[in-house]
C-alpha cells in the first residue's frame, strides 16, 4: 500500500475542501491514488449532503452587496441549521459572494442562481461541497436585487436583519432609513402596499373586540375603522415616527431633507420558518441511535 503522507492529504484537502480526516480515510481507501480518493470523497460528500437536505434550516445570515457606483445592489438570505455554523468563515464568504453574484448577474430565481458559474463549478456544486465540509444543511432561501438611477443604502444588524433601500437624497438619509427599517420592521411604504390578508386579520380582531363593548353599531364601526387605521400607521414606513426624532414621521423627515424613498427590502433570518424542537431526552436517544 502506498504511504499516505501529510503532503498528499493536504493536496486532497485543497482540491476538495473536505475535512482532514475524511481526506485521509479516502486516500487510505484509494490506496494513495489521488484521483480515486477525490471521487470517493465526491460520493461521500454527496451522500452527506443528501442526508443533510432533509433537516430544517432556520438559522443563517443575510448577505448584502452594493456596487461601487451605488446603482445596483442585492440582499440574500442563506440558511443553515445552527447559529454555530452561521459564524463559520467559509459560510460567511459563500453568502457575501452570492450577494455580489445576484447584483451583477441578475438571476431570475434561486434555481437560476444555483446554475450560475461559481469558482470551479456552479453555485449548487459549491453549496453541496460546503454542506459536506461543514456537516449541516445549507439552503439559499431568497434574494432581491435593485437596479436604480437613484441611490442605494443598506444596513445589516448582527447578520440576522438586512435592509436594502432605494432612495433619493443625501447619503445620511439613506443610512437613517435603513437603520430605522431594521429597528421597526415596517410591512410596506404606505397603506397601499400592506397585504390585504394582514388588514383583514387586523379588522377581524378589531371587530371581535368592538362587538364585546356593547355599544351601538355605528360606534362599533368607527371603533373598528379606528383600530385598522392605527394598525396601518404602525406598519407603514412613511407613517411611522422616525426613531431618531419621534416628533416627526418618516414622511415628514424626508420632506424636511428634500429626500424620497422608492422602495425597501427587509429580510429577517428564519422569518416564517418553523424551527424543529426536541427535548433533551429525545436528543440523547437520537444521538445514541445514530451511533448504533
UniProtKB/Swiss-Prot annotation:
Listed Gene3D superfamilies: 1.10.286.20, DNA helicase RuvA subunit, C-terminal domain, Elongation factor Ts, dimerisation domain
| Superkingdom per UniProt | Bacteria
Q: Which CDD domains match?
A: UBA_EF-Ts (cd14275)
Keywords in alphabetical order? Cytoplasm, Elongation factor, Protein biosynthesis
**One MF annotation (Gene Ontology) recorded for this entry:** translation elongation factor activity
PROSITE patterns in the record, alphabetically? EF_TS_2
| Location of region: Involved in Mg(2+) ion dislocation from EF-Tu | 82-85
One Pfam match: EF_TS
Q: Where in the cell is it found?
A: Cytoplasm
Q: What is its main location?
A: cytoplasm
Q: Name one GO cellular component term.
A: cytoplasm
* Function, as annotated: Associates with the EF-Tu.GDP complex and induces the exchange of GDP to GTP. It remains bound to the aminoacyl-tRNA.EF-Tu.GTP complex up to the GTP hydrolysis stage on the ribosome.
For this protein, the record's HAMAP family field holds: EF_Ts
Protein family (similarity comment): Belongs to the EF-Ts family.
What is the name of this protein?
Elongation factor Ts
Amino acid at each position: 500500500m502506498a504511504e499516505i503522507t501529510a503532503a498528499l492529504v493536504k493536496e486532497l484537502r485543497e482540491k476538495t475542501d473536505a475535512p482532514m480526516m475524511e481526506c485521509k480515510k479516502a486516500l487510505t481507501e484509494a490506496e494513495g491514488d489521488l484521483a480515486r480518493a477525490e471521487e470517493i470523497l465526491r460520493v461521500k460528500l454527496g451522500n452527506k449532503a443528501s442526508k443533510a437536505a432533509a433537516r430544517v434550516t432556520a438559522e443563517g445570515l443575510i448577505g448584502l452587496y452594493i456596487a461601487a457606483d451605488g446603482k445596483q445592489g442585492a440582499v440574500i438570505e442563506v440558511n443553515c441549521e445552527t447559529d454555530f455554523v452561521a459564524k463559520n468563515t467559509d459560510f460567511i464568504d459563500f453568502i457575501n459572494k452570492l450577494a455580489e453574484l445576484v447584483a451583477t448577474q441578475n438571476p431570475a430565481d434561486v434555481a437560476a442562481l444555483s446554475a450560475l458559474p461559481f469558482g470551479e463549478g456552479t453555485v449548487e456544486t459549491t453549496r453541496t461541497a460546503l454542506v459536506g465540509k461543514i456537516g449541516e444543511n445549507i439552503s439559499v432561501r431568497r434574494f432581491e436585487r435593485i437596479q436604480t438611477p437613484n441611490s442605494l443604502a443598506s444596513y445589516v444588524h448582527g447578520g440576522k436583519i438586512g435592509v436594502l433601500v432605494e432612495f433619493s437624497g443625501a447619503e445620511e438619509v439613506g443610512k437613517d432609513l435603513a437603520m430605522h427599517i431594521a429597528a421597526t420592521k415596517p410591512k410596506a411604504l404606505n397603506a397601499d402596499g400592506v397585504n390585504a390578508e394582514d388588514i383583514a386579520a387586523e379588522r377581524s380582531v378589531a371587530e371581535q373586540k368592538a362587538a364585546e363593548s356593547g355599544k351601538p353599531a355605528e360606534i362599533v364601526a368607527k371603533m373598528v375603522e379606528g383600530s385598522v387605521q392605527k394598525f396601518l400607521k404602525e406598519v407603514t414606513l412613511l407613517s411611522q415616527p422616525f426613531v431618531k426624532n419621534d416628533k416627526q414621521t418618516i414622511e415628514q423627515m424626508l420632506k424636511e431633507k428634500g429626500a424620497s424613498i422608492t422602495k425597501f427590502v427587509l429580510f429577517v433570518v428564519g422569518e416564517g420558518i418553523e424551527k424543529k424542537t426536541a427535548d433533551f431526552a429525545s436528543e440523547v436517544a437520537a444521538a445514541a441511535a445514530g451511533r448504533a
